[in-house]
Amino acid sequence: QANMTSLNGIRFGFNCSMLRAWWVMLGLPVLLALVFWFALYLIAQVTTSIGGLFFNLVALSLLSAIGLGVVHGITYSKWMPLLGNNATFGIHKFSIQVNVKECIKGCMLAILTMVPFIIVIGIMIAPVFQQLMMMTMLGRSDAGSEFVLQYYPQIMASYFLYFVAILVFASYLYVTLRSLFLNNLTLANGTIRFHSSVTAIGMLLRMLAVLMGSSITCGLAYPWLKMWMV
């Protein structure tokens, strides 16, 4: 892609070891994910014998958020130098130095943006599960259609909030990582610096516009709308 792109007649370039690219793009994320899930499994075995169900859910949810933030933060902190330090523009080389802690912090904050939505969804959907369990205990499993109609507004509202939560999470994470990448990227030994001014709200509005535009055009406008988010 870089070799086929040019600006004012000057071509971009990219040169990187295939083995290193495979390790950074695939090997390291898989290894970190395996270590994370194994550690979470061991912690779950310990907490099961210590506290009750509510304590285990809270503890494991908190540890999962922290672990996912660490895994994604480390992964993205390796991806950025792979792309930035191996790219060129004509005879000039790009250079980037990324702080791993900032990447981890950004990923954790992105995950935390979903917490308010999860709490609201839990409050809305809890009566649904309670009623479902009660019906199962009373042997009224055949009344499923009536049950769905009764709680249809809560179920649809929960799906809608879940969809909004994903968009908020994606927009915040994209803007955070984009800012970390561009604000630390330099060209020609630091002579030229880059800056990102996109906000999370602005990116969220762009994502909504892309989804609406793609839906209206049955996906035909997606390639052009996607370029608007770069």
Region annotations inferred by a language model:
Residues 1, 66-73, 115, 208-228:
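Hydrophobic, aromatic-rich membrane-embedded alpha-helical segments
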Residues 14-34, 96-117, 196-216:
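Loop-to-transmembrane boundary segments
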Residues 2-21, 81-103, 179-201:
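Juxtamembrane inter-helical linkers in multi-pass membrane proteins
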Residues 1-40, 44, 65-77:
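Transmembrane-helix bundle segments that line or gate the permeation/cavity pathway
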Residues 33-68, 118-170, 226, 230:
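Membrane-helix interface segments in multi-pass membrane proteins
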Residues 56-65, 98, 106-110, 150-167, ...:
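Pore-lining and gate-forming transmembrane alpha-helices of multi-pass membrane transport proteins
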Residues 31, 35, 39, 43, ...:
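Alpha-helical membrane-inserting segments
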Residues 2-3, 69, 73-81, 85, ...:
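Short helix-terminus and kink motifs of transmembrane alpha helices
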